[in-house]
């Protein structure tokens, strides 16, 4: 590992030791964050897969009923029955924080247009029970479908944050900290060499002075 290009002084040694302490502490905090993010991410992925499976199954069942309804009803009557929306939906998207990751939190409100609370956008005279079943199932899918969108977006954002954190952890672990350790070791070695050199010079001066005194 290449060391940093710095002057081998005691002041620089003190500064680098402080940087190493900060980097080591930061590495531990980021590693802990990475581990916790991974734990939550795995739980979220499992829940996402289960939720997606449920939603796909519900949609498949609803489509089966639509196919049956289409077989029993004319295309014109079917299209006319589902042409006009029965309810209005308003969606509020807020943000919640999970381990420094801002993920969406979705809430929606449903408002049926007529007073009797019926979810069916048609009368019952010319339509089939299969169409009723399809509409009812689609109506019940919406909350889960919205939750699925929320969970999948949260999963994506957490995956991005895990990757960012992993890069920072690796940069500290494999580059910054080893460079600091190598540079500190180099400065300590240079300072020890300087001390030994200074001590040798002092010993030589002392010897010379002693010889001068003996010759007097």
Swiss-Prot record:
One Gene Ontology term from the biological process aspect of the record: proton motive force-driven plasma membrane ATP synthesis
Keywords in alphabetical order: ATP synthesis, Hydrogen ion transport, Ion transport, Transport
GO molecular function: ATP binding; proton-transporting ATP synthase activity, rotational mechanism; proton-transporting ATPase activity, rotational mechanism
Gene3D superfamilies, per the entry: 1.10.287.3240
Top-level taxon: Bacteria
Function field: Produces ATP from ADP in the presence of a proton gradient across the membrane.
Family in the record: Belongs to the V-ATPase D subunit family.
Protein's name according to its UniProt entry: V-type ATP synthase subunit D
Organism name: Clostridium novyi (strain NT)
């Amino acid at each position: 590992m290449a060391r940093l290009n710095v002057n081998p002084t005691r002041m620089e040694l003190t500064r680098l030791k402080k940087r190493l302490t900060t980097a080591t502490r930061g590495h531990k905090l980021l590693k802990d964050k990475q581990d916790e993010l991974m734990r939550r991410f795995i739980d979220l992925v499992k829940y996402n897969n289960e939720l997606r499976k449920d939603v796909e199954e519900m949609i498949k069942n609803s489509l089966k009923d639509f196919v049956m309804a289409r077989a029993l009803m004319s295309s014109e009557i079917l299209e006319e029955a589902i042409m006009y929306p029965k309810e209005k939906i308003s969606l509020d998207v807020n943000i919640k924080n999970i381990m420094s990751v801002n993920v969406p939190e979705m809430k929606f409100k449903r408002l049926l247009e007529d007073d009797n609370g019926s979810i069916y956008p048609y009368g019952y005279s010319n339509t089939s029970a299969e169409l009723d079943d399809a509409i009812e199932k689609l109506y019940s899918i919406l909350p889960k479908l919205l939750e699925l969108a929320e969970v999948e977006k949260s999963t994506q954002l957490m995956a991005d944050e895990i990757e960012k954190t992993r890069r920072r952890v690796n940069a500290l672990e494999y580059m910054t900290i080893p460079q600091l350790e190598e540079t500190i070791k180099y400065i300590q070695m240079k300072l020890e060499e300087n001390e030994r050199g200074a001590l040798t010079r002092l010993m030589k001066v002392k010897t010379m002075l002693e010889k001068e005194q003996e010759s007097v």
